[in-house]
């Protein structure tokens, strides 16, 4: 009898122990996986899969007719993209402790993707996942994040790139008066060849971005930890883009760093830009980077707006999507690309209007670049800048 009881209870006890262990550790497994590979989390919402190009126009029309972008944006906001939130606690705490350097304290970088002044691009090339100390954050904190390009599965679904993938962009808030020298030092240390500025100095009487280049020829900018001399080598305007060539010389460095800045003037807050002028900005950005390949000599492109999220995320995702569309004209995954990009900085593509703009941008590109699929024209929100046709910007590179 004893043998029978043991034969029954011992397997039962083992099964119970296994079930308990599975219950205890089931929430930890995704966190461990997230350190190596990251897949978009499953939720109760039914998010759209990658859209076949031949169905894109119909999909866009359906979403527009049903006011679907607002609902889709809310569904995306419910996703727990940052399921390893606990791992970002240090960064968020450190960022709030340096609140005077944040333009918006509700928009701060994550630990895994935070840019630090004092940690140059040469170091990033060797180690994409460093251990960051509190001391380093206290001196080198800046509200800026590395953003990596997404990868794609066999069916066209988006996968977040691992940390070993080099970041192509730095998403940053508009510099404050007190952080201009920090921002310029970051541009030099990261060997950034290009800055995309998506805001004006002021909008509605409110300062949006401290001017970090001289009004005339040369100006010195100083912060608590850094001092930088900036020389404006050239400035020209074409369409809605102002192009500037800046020479930045941090104190103590033997030679200056030259960077090109494109300031896009056709994007008011809480609005979307003219499609033609936005497309032209993407094109001149692509042409410039085609001659300044990222590697030992050049680092990421800096993209900045007021909070480094809404306009900045929209621009970066638009560039990712167009590049993907040119390489693979089978399908496009806008929702997946947005969610994957938010892994590196929260709230990228901040509003439903910006999400809708991305759909319209892809529709525009399908027709403009004679890609496969049919297009449908959707009226965008009215803006005075949209009344004029913007010519292709003829900057030399």
Predicted features along the sequence, with ranges:
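Cys-based phosphatases of the PTP/DUSP/CDC25 superfamily and their flanking regulatory architecture
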Residues: 1-397
């Amino acid at each position: 009898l004893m043998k029978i009881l043991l034969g029954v209870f011992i397997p039962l006890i083992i099964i119970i122990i296994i079930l308990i262990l599975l219950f205890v550790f089931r929430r930890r497994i995704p966190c461990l996986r997230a350190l190596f590979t990251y897949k978009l989390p499953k939720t109760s919402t039914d998010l759209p899969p990658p859209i076949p190009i031949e169905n894109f126009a119909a999909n866009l029309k359906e979403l527009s007719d049903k006011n679907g972008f607002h609902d889709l944006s809310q569904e995306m906001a419910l996703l727990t993209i940052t399921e390893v939130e606990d791992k970002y606690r240090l960064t968020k705490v450190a960022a709030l402790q340096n609140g005077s350097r944040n333009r918006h304290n509700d928009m701060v970088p994550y630990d895994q993707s935070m840019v630090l002044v004092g940690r140059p691009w040469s170091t990033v090339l060797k180690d994409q996942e460093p251990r960051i100390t509190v001391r380093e954050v206290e001196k080198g904190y800046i509200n800026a994040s590395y953003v990596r390009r997404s990868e794609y599965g066999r069916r066209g679904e988006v996968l977040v790139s691992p940390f070993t993938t080099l970041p192509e962009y730095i998403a940053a808030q508009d510099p404050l008066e007190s952080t201009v020298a920090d921002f310029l030092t970051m541009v030099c240390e990261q060997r950034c060849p290009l800055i995309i500025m998506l805001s004006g100095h002021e909008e509605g009487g409110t300062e949006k971005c401290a001017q970090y280049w001289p009004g005339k020829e040369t100006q010195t900018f100083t912060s608590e930890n850094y001092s930088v001399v900036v020389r404006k080598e050239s400035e020209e305007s074409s369409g809605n883009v102002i192009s500037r060539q800046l020479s930045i010389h941090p104190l103590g460095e033997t030679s200056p760093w030259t960077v090109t800045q494109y300031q896009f003037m056709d994007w008011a807050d809480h609005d979307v830009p003219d499609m033609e002028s936005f497309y032209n900005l993407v094109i001149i950005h692509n042409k410039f980077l085609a001659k300044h390949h990222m590697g030992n000599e050049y680092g990421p492109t800096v993209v900045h707006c007021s909070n480094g999220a809404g306009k900045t995320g929209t621009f970066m995702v638009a560039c990712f999507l167009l590049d993907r569309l040119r390489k693979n004209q089978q399908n496009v995954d806008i929702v997946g690309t947005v969610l994957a990009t938010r892994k590196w900085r929260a709230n990228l593509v901040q509003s439903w209007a910006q999400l809708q703009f991305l759909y319209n941008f892809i529709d525009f590109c399908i027709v403009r670049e004679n890609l496969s699929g049919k297009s449908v024209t959707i009226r965008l929100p009215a803006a005075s800048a949209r009344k004029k046709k913007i010519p292709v910007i003829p900057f030399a590179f």
